[in-house]
A protein has these predicted regions:
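Non-catalytic terminal accessory segments
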Residues: 1-141
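Soluble catalytic domains of enzymes that build or remodel membrane lipids, polysaccharides, and related
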Residues: 156-404
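N-terminal active-site segment of His-dependent metallophosphoesterases
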Residues: 4-22, 29, 60-73, 119, ...
């Protein structure tokens, strides 16, 4: 993930302090119900020891990132991310609910309000805390298959019923070499017996060393007609400091070579033609292309160059922004597959209702989108980065069937 500036870190720490001061004020009211001064003082000390420890840890981590071992760095960032969210969000909700209830209260007397309202607020804080903890320890690896059927007028008849598995955003460094975690995902994928497996980028967080041992795991993925992949923004090493461009390039080459080890064809602004009994479709793949601040390595015209005569095309492009900017109404690409957003790893993801804060940044953030005869599917991703949890946004394996 992209590094935060010291200014943003200081703002975060100030926000934590402000919310904790308000929370502590209302905590004093709740603890009036406790008669033991020892217990009360223990609660107060524990409250501030945690807050001071968290802020100190965040600042120290930021100040030492440049010299820290990369493996340890990634683990510590994720740990502090989880601690910060688990602490800050419930306290913010608690403080907000209690303050609103207290200053708009016309039911309880002032004396009653100082005790009853904070208790109500306490329950309002416990709920998000439970959701966050559940998202960290239970939802993070609860892989979900989403099955959809898409109809195309231009689909060649010999490709009727084509079975595609679409996965994205593995971020293998976040798994900390716990290879068994992906066993169930691989089993779910292979049970579908797909014709194609498409991976749309962000194999790693930053570094090629994250891939150690994963070739034996990912090589188990099976597809009848082929496995294809493209690169995501994290695969270029752009979010790390390197001793030299040569070292950065070496890291990049190792990441690209990994795809050969797991029998995936990496499409770098290229296309591949698949033929069944004389009928053809084209599978295109571009390097990462995103709106600023993301780089635009992708060259769609280059990938289209040798397949203009193939009427049915599938595009693999990591960032869904690419679809709106360069694909829709500018090409005849029938289906585009993307990832990148993770669904923010948080939101409401029901059958008829989907919402996530990420939708205010990305118009196309999760699920199926259509513009005339062109489709885009954005997966919520299989892995995670930053916050070590998923809140209402389970990791996704997409199973797509193509029909006429």
């Amino acid at each position: 993930m992209r590094p935060f500036s010291f200014f943003k870190i200081i703002l975060l720490c100030l926000a934590i302090v402000v919310v904790d001061i308000i929370t502590f004020y209302w905590l004093l009211s709740i603890t009036q119900l406790i008669t033991s001064s020892l217990i009360k003082n223990s609660i107060y000390i524990a409250f501030w020891v945690f807050t001071i420890g968290l802020i100190t840890g965040i600042i120290l981590l930021k100040s030492r990132l440049a010299t820290m071992n990369t493996y340890r760095k990634q683990w510590l960032i994720s740990s502090f991310y989880g601690l910060s969210v688990s602490s800050f969000v419930p306290k913010l909700i608690f403080a907000t609910v209690v303050s609103i209830l207290y200053f708009t209260n016309y039911v309880f007397s002032e004396k009653e309000s100082l005790i009853i309202i904070p208790i109500i607020g306490l329950f309002s804080g416990f709920l998000p805390f439970f959701i966050i903890v559940y998202g960290i320890f239970r939802t993070l690896y609860r892989f979900k298959i989403r099955h959809l059927k898409i109809k195309f007028e231009g689909l060649p008849k010999n490709f009727e019923g084509l079975r595609i598995i679409h996965i994205s955003d593995l971020h293998l460094g976040s798994f900390n070499f716990r290879y068994h975690i992906l066993d169930r995902a691989i089993k779910l994928i292979n049970n579908v017996a797909p014709d194609f497996i498409f991976f749309t980028g962000d194999l790693v967080n930053n570094y090629a060393w994250e891939l150690k041992g994963w070739d034996k795991v990912l090589k188990q993925l099976s597809a009848k007609k082929g496995k294809y992949a493209v690169l995501g923004n994290h695969d270029y090493g752009d979010y790390s400091k390197w001793k030299s461009l040569k070292v950065k390039q070496s890291n990049f080459e190792l990441i690209k070579y990994f795809y050969k080890k797991i029998d995936f064809k990496l499409l770098l602004n290229k296309a591949d033609i698949v033929e069944i009994d004389g009928e053809k479709i084209a599978i295109l793949g571009v390097e990462n292309w995103g709106n600023p601040p993301f780089k635009q390595y992708g060259d769609l015209q280059k990938s289209l160059k040798n397949v203009t005569n193939i009427p049915f095309k599938i595009l693999l492009s990591h960032d869904p922004s690419h679809w709106k900017e360069e694909v829709v109404e500018k090409t005849n690409i029938a289906l585009t597959l993307s990832g990148h957003t993770h669904g923010m790893q948080a939101g409401i993801d029901l059958k008829n209702k989907n919402w996530s804060p990420i939708q205010y940044k990305y118009k196309h953030w999760a699920g199926l989108y259509k513009n005339n005869k062109q489709y885009l599917y954005v997966t919520r991703g299989l892995g995670w980065i930053g916050f070590p949890g998923r809140l209402g946004m389970r990791p996704e394996i997409t199973f797509i069937e193509l029909h006429k």
